[in-house]
Each structure stands twice: as C-alpha cells, then as structure tokens.
Amino acid sequence: MKKKVALHNLGCKVNSYELEAMQQLLEQAGYEIVPFEPGADVYVINTCTVTNIADRKSRQMLHKAKKMNPDAVVVATGCYVQTDEGKLETDEAVDLVLGNNQKKNIVEVLAEFEKEHQRQAHIIKINQTKEYEELEISRTAEHVRAYIKVQDGCNQFCTYCIIPYARGRVRSREKENILNEVHKLAKAGYKEVVLTGIHLSSYGVDFPEDKKETLLSLIQAVNEVEGIQRIRLGSLEPGIVTEEFAKELSSMPKVCPHFHLSLQSGCDTTLERMNRRYRSAEYKARCELLRKYFGNPALTTDVIVGFPMETEEDFQASYDFVKDIHFYETHIFKYSRRHGTKAAAMSGQLTEAEKAVRSDKMLELHQKRAAEYETSLLGKTLEVLLEEEVEIDGKAYYLGHSREYVKVAVLKTEEYGVNDIPAVKVEKTLQPHILQGEEIQVL
C-alpha cells in the first residue's frame, strides 16, 4: 500500500515552488499525495521566518500535523528550520528537520527514517554554501501559470531582514536548466511563466566571467521559448531598472507590464537605517523609466511601517512618497523584530499600537490607489489569461488576469475556456478588484 503524504506551504513563491518540487519527487518515489487532513502517514511543512507571525504559524502547523496523526512522520523544512537555532530538534512534534538546500533529499531522508526510526536533523551552514540546489517542476497547482525559481540567497543584509541568514548567499541557477524547465512547461500547455528568486535582481552575479549571465539575458532567452506567451517577473530591486533594462524589456512583447519594485520606505532617513541601497529620488526615477517605456504599467511594492526610530515625520514622508508614485498595489508590513538582525538591537522600537495606526493609514491609501488604477483600465482592450470558472451573482464567468495582473471576468461561453487568452474590452467593475469585460477575439 502506498504511503500517504500531506504537504503544507508557508511563505513566499520560492517556498511554494520548492514544495511543489518536493511533492513531485515524493510522487515519483511512489507516495500518494493527500490533503492536509487527518489520515496521512507523512506531513511535510515548508516553514517561513520572514516575521514573528510566520514563525508562530510554522510552529502551529507542525503541532497541528502531529495532533492529526500522532503516529505520522512530521517533517519540518524551510526558513524557520534554518534560523531557529536547533529548537525544533527537541520539539516532540517534529520527527525530521530538513534545512534549506537539503530539500532535494526528501525521499532519501524519509527512507532512512523508515529504517532507523530515530529523530534526525539535516541542516547545513547555509551561509557557507555556494551550491544552488537544483529542483524542478513539471506542473503546478495553478495549471495555467508557472513560477520558476531561478536564484536563491541574498547578499544585501538589510538591517530588518532575517532572510540572508535563512537562505545564504546569492546562488544562481544555470540558464540551461532554467530553459529546459521552461520548454517542458510550455509543452505541458503553460502559457505564462513567472521568474522568481530570493533576490531576483542578483541573478548571475555569482557566475564566473566566462559564463556571465544577467537577469536581462535570462529574460531574453526565455522570450525565445515557443509556446510561452507571457513572462512575469518577481520582486525587483530599483537599481536594476536602468534605461537599457527598461528599453530592452519593452521590446519583448511577452514581458508583462507589471513590475514589483521593492521600496520598504519612502523616507530617506529610514532607508539609510534599513541599509537599502537607494534613496527616494532614485526610486522615483526608476518608476518613471518603466512608465516611459510601458505607458501605464502596474507598479506594485512593499512598505514597512513602524521601523525603529521612525518618527511621525518619517512616516509622513514615506506615506507622501507612496501617494505620489501611484502604485497599483502596496503590500504593507508592520515592522517585525527579528532576533539576530541589526534592527532588532536598535533603540527607538515602536509599540504595536503605533505600528497598527500607521499600517491602517497606509492601507487606506493602497485601497484608494488600487481602485484608481483599475478605473484607468475601463474602456481599454486587455489580454486576459483565463484561469478558472466562477459564479458571481448567479452568473457563470471565466476569471483570469490581464497582462497588468488585474483580475478580469468574462461571461462563460463555448468560444473559449480555461487557459485561453481572449482580447477583452473592459466595461465596468463587477466586484471590488474584479473588472468585467466582453470578449472580442481569442488570441
């Protein structure tokens, strides 16, 4: 009888990719994949440590798994595992601990546990490794859009961030391996790929001179893959957006006009304390370059509120800057004090109440700007990748995303279906953050 394994992911798209790769390795080894419910023989939890809340959720899911089946093997892997300083190795809810850069060994580690029945920890010194852990997927849970991990690690060491300690230094994936995966996904019917990594803008910086690659050269190569109609990019550092970069991207019709430029704060004083490598004027110039070459792209970002020593004036400067840029989406994070980072030792730590007030104010601005951007698309013809069938107000629709990553619904007909990309004239707002359009033609 096949062993049953249930998997659960916490955290970013890189984590999601790695969990899907582990799932496919387990399937190939003869395991049956089942929902994360009671009855599994093995539970694999891919943990996250980006905030204190992520740490707590990681611990909760591990304990939940053991409660669902006390006889099951519970495997903890991912970023929380890498940074918890061995605490999980003594946690009775956890049988196996698998650090980052060890996920490819999931099948062998489980087989070894079956023989020994002894709790084990497989963790390397992540900051010393130069090896990129080669994982691959042949399909994804999304069915129409595939996230592809091209890079791991980060060399930036922003003062608030624990991730370099969890992921190690920059390690880039060989371009040939990336392209092989893209070709396989294209043959499997995927029309959109999203290039993602821990610090995507650093792709290729660790390669030797004789095989130098950059993120731009990688995108150019992916652009040549037949069958792929859309290329989307994960989070970018502002510094990568030069005139050449923006111009070259705009010359590739597959590249979507949707860019996530990490900001964190619009206040120069705070940016300096954060050890960010740019200031607000430079960031604004990068946004203007993207608008110069893409017209009305969807610009999205991350902002931290309540960073140590952030005064009311500092917050207001950040708020005013975000307001001025007109982002489509702003992901707002209340500063989370991460043990081992420089910011954790800074004076001037703000209360949770102060952070909440600032977060709420920034969230109101985000909601207003999101609605404004969606309104700017009314009357336009957008290409929409249809992803699922939904029912809204008693009517059947296909729901998908435009190239700008805005949700658009079209009435269900026999002329097209999931994974088609019709040209849609957007007519109105159907629901908050869902536009409605009328199909013109299937591309």
For the regions a language model picked out, list residue spans one by one.
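Flexible glycine-/small-residue-rich
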Residues: 9, 197, 235, 263-265, ...
